């Protein structure tokens, strides 16, 4: 996880403007650099580095002798960079995975380049020879990117919105900052005065499409057809490959472990592959919760079963509530379920950074959206409607779960890796017949559970453990995080405030006291930026008024009441 930042055509003092880049210093605690672009006194790059690959030569912007006119600032991991280097016989100057972007661009242009990348990324590529600027982001938006572009051609780009909101520009006192769309790249012309003009925004990949880079993958051949045993075999192959390719790092690997299906599968497969790779350390797994919470108990079972070096982080309701302000500042959103679920992830990331040497952290993010794991999928009117909803959730990941996962870990200088959002694994899963992917026998993610039933990766009670929302599983049924928050906000927001909510917050008006409380905090940090969240995350088909799984009639808990 790194932080990237760039300005083109600034009409204010760059030394003053660069101060805004320090607001994302948490993303790269190992080193930082600011560099002016040759020949353009009002253009510069900023970079905060978390050294994960090639600690000696990995500073950015990346420039190599062969292409002196190319400047690259990127945040991400390109898992197939070595395969592409060997395939096209590129001569590398560094061991940095991102260098492949320069070679591919020189060989085939921006579209072929971005379609060949197997990984997660957000980048700014400058070509001074052809006077072009390119912005790009991975399919699911696992790595964040924000931009501000004024009518007169001032462009500002950053990993997080907080690095842009305080920038000054003569013609636009209030810069419109917006997220760069996942699965897209943008082409901009660079003018002699350093300003830019947008040429085109291109959608280069959809989650259901098999990626172009698949033809160069080293994964073993998949079997054709949709017979259940064939599908299960292919899913195991692709999942194991998704884990394996993400072992690329020079830093210690750890894994978040809630004791739910997704994180448990990741942890078990990860530990197995680390042993095969003969890494010189034990896998550290991390669980958080209040004492005797369902997640802590389940995670302990998994850790004992797989033999990881397990860490349990206990927190109380007061610590959780006190963290809300810094959590919302880090997230840059006021979405209710995102904030709720982020508290535990924020606190455990803080623990990992302070108490361990694990830096690259695996997690199970993306599985619920991909495999129809949310409880409300039981209410889907048809397999086809469930399929549509799954694709919608994946398309909006960058606003919700992926945002949460990135900001809570990056806030503490950690890098998150999410194998369930692997291009090959996800596109194959989405290609399966809709009826194979829906809940079965009252159990969500039935196909995924069935796939690993005979693998001995996990205890049966974990493999078939019902869905538990992370924000609820870290507490208990009797005193859930949901209930704790409702009791707290009842004393912070009164009925009079709620009656005037639509006047105070006309856009995305909060409908609950909890939502009002979060919105107040957000507006304090980011006044006038409510449109960063287009809509609240809510379950479908059930007329819910709150996103908590605790409020659903289908909810089942493995905890003792």
Swiss-Prot record:
InterPro entries: Asn_synth_AEB (IPR006426), Asn_synthase (IPR001962), Asn_Synthetase (IPR050795), AsnB_N (IPR033738), GATase_2_dom (IPR017932), Ntn_hydrolases_N (IPR029055), Rossmann-like_a/b/a_fold (IPR014729). It comes from the Eukaryota. The active site is at residue 2. One of its GO terms (cellular component) is cytosol. The modification Phosphothreonine is found at residue 545. L-glutamine binds at residues 49-53, 75-77, 97. Residues 213-536 form the Asparagine synthetase domain. It holds the Pfam family Asn_synthase. ATP binds at residues 256, 288, 363-364. Pathway: Amino-acid biosynthesis; L-asparagine biosynthesis; L-asparagine from L-aspartate (L-Gln route): step 1/1. Transmembrane segments: none annotated. One of its GO terms (molecular function) is asparagine synthase (glutamine-hydrolyzing) activity. It catalyses: L-aspartate + L-glutamine + ATP + H2O = L-asparagine + L-glutamate + AMP + diphosphate + H(+). One of its GO terms (biological process) is response to mechanical stimulus. Residues 2-191 form the Glutamine amidotransferase type-2 domain. Keywords: Acetylation, Amino-acid biosynthesis, Asparagine biosynthesis, ATP-binding, Glutamine amidotransferase, Ligase, Nucleotide-binding, Phosphoprotein. The record marks 365 as: Important for beta-aspartyl-AMP intermediate formation. The modification Phosphoserine is found at residue 557. Its EC number is 6.3.5.4. It is an enzyme of class 6 (ligase). The modification N6-acetyllysine is found at residue 385. This is Asparagine synthetase [glutamine-hydrolyzing]. It comes from Rattus norvegicus. The gene is Asns.
């Amino acid at each position: 996880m790194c932080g990237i930042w760039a300005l083109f055509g600034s009409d204010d003092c760059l030394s003053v403007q660069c101060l805004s880049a320090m607001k994302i210093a948490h993303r790269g605690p190992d080193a930082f650099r600011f560099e002016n672009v040759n020949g353009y006194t009002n253009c510069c790059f900023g970079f905060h580095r978390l050294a994960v690959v090639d600690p000696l030569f990995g500073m950015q912007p990346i420039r190599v002798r062969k292409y002196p006119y190319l400047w690259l600032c990127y945040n991400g991991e390109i898992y197939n960079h070595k395969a592409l280097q060997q395939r096209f016989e590129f001569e590398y100057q560094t061991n940095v995975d991102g260098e492949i972007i320069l070679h591919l661009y020189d060989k085939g242009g921006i579209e072929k380049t971005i379609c060949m990348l197997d990984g997660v990324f957000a980048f700014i590529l400058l070509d001074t020879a052809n006077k072009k600027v390119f912005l790009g982001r991975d399919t699911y938006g696992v790595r964040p990117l924000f931009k501000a572009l004024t009518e007169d051609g001032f462009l500002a780009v950053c990993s997080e919105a907080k690095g842009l909101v305080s920038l000054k520009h003569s013609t636009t006192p209030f810069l419109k900052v917006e997220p760069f769309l996942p699965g897209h790249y943008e082409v901009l012309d660079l003018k002699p005065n350093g300003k830019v003009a947008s040429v085109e925004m291109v959608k280069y990949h959809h989650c259901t499409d098999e990626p172009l880079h698949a033809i160069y993958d080293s994964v073993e051949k998949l079997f054709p057809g949709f017979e259940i045993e064939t599908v299960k075999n292919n899913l195991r192959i692709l999942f194991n490959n998704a884990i394996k390719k993400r072992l690329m790092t020079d830093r210690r690997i750890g894994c978040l472990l809630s004791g739910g299906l997704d994180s448990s599968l990741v942890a078990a497969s990860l530990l197995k592959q680390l042993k095969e790779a003969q890494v010189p350390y034990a896998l550290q797994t991390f669980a958080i919760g209040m004492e005797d919470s369902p997640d802590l108990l389940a995670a302990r079972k998994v850790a004992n079963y797989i033999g990881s070096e397990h860490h349990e982080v206990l927190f109380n309701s007061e610590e959780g509530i006190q963290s809300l302000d810094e959590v919302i500042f880090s997230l840059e959103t006021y979405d209710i379920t995102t904030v709720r679920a982020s508290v535990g992830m924020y606190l455990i990331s803080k623990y990992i950074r302070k108490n361990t040497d694990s830096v690259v952290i695996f997690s199970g993010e993306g599985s619920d959206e991909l495999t129809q794991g949310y409880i409300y999928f039981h209410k889907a009117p048809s397999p086809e409607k469930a399929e549509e909803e799954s694709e919608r959730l994946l398309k909006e990941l960058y606003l919700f779960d992926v945002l949460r996962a990135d900001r809570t870990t990056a806030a503490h200088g950690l890098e998150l890796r999410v194998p369930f959002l692997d291009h090959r694994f996800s596109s194959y899963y989405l290609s399966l017949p809709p009826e194979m992917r829906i809940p079965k026998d009252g159990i969500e993610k039935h196909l995924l559970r069935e796939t690993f039933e005979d693998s001995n990766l996990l205890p049966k009670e974990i493999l078939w453990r019902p869905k538990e929302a992370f924000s609820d599983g870290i507490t208990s049924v009797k005193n859930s995080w949901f209930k704790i928050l409702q009791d707290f906000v009842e004393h912070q927001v009164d009925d009079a405030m709620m009656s005037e909510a639509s006047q105070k917050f006309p856009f995305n008006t909060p409908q609950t006291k909890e939502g009002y409380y979060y919105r107040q905090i957000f507006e304090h940090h980011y006044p006038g930026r409510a449109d960063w969240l287009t809509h609240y995350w809510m379950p479908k088909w059930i007329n819910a008024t709150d996103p908590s799984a605790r409020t659903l009639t289908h909810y089942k808990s493995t905890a003792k009441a």
